[in-house]
Amino acid sequence: MKRKTLTFLLIISTILLTGCIKRDDMEGIDIITTIYPIEYVTKRLYQDNANITSIYPHGVNIEEYKLTNKQLKDFSNNDLLIYNGNSNDREYATIILEKNKNIKIIDASYGLEETYSKSDIWLNPSNILMLAQNIKQELSDYIDNPYLKQEIENNYKLLKLDISELDTELNRTAKNSTNKKIISYDESLKFLEKYGFEVINLISENKEIDSNMLNCIDEFCCV
């Protein structure tokens, strides 16, 4: 009897160690994301509980990169799509959902501040925190297992701490800066204005650098 009990315990231990028993239907699933900030946040929150990849190859210009019909069909075979509904990502999300009515979706953009570029989503601490809140909440809504939910909550708290430290550092830098002017090629750094910086965009709406901008550059370089 003792030998049977020991054998049973060994089998159970082996199953648990090899991960053969899933705690939740959302564990071990295949998740696709769009832009890198969403991929990063999802990996920070869900870590090894799912296979997480982006629809965009790393290093490509997502403004110019176009997915093929075959790629969209392949991506539709995944279990969950997380995307930015404030961009053309929603077009891809619509196509993928049409190809697979059962795929779960999360729009991570709810409540985001106005963005001036895709870079603004990644660089702005307020936006990255909102992404994290949305993804955490939507993942928790899909998950039944309380332990997995708590794991995501703990990961969120660590990520929130990192974001808060970045926000504090930006405030400290702005406060201690004698020259608060920042020259940027585009509007991707415009969010820094809320910290007290003056952001000067080299490229205006007509794509030309005017004399006022040249004077600003000269003043900045001579400081």
Residue map of PLM features:
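Secretory targeting signatures
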Residues: 1-20
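Extracytoplasmic metal-acquisition and chelation regions
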Residues: 19-223
